[in-house]
Amino acid sequence: MWPRDFSERLESWAQLRQQCQTLDSEPALIKINTWWFQAPWTAYHLHWDDQQDWPDPWQLLSDNQYCPVARGLGIMYTISMLDREDLQDCRMIEYQSDNLVLVSQEKYILNWDPDQVVNISLGRSKPRRQVSQEQIKQKIR
């Protein structure tokens, strides 16, 4: 169940990061993906055209509105704050009508399915837009 108020969301998010610190990469990514899919969904909150104005992780949790872009951003913030050597190459892409988080040289795809992290080829199509983990880390500082 998604935490109701901001302080509970902060505590739950901190616990998530702490738990994922010691898990192998795939179980950690599944746990992160599952946690963010519990967030209350809204059709539109953030847009790629407004990337410069995207909230930092604390504002994202405070806003408590999660469209697919916002949920992907939350996943990216979570992975980035783990600062794990094996999870240093994630990026969020706009691919067709989806906003996906790709990790470990696209081995894992998050923000696609609530119950699993998928491992499929996206083919040769180029993403329309993307944001790297390094760009996301700039919002955390």
Where are these regions (language model features)?
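A structural boundary/capping signal
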Residues: 1-141
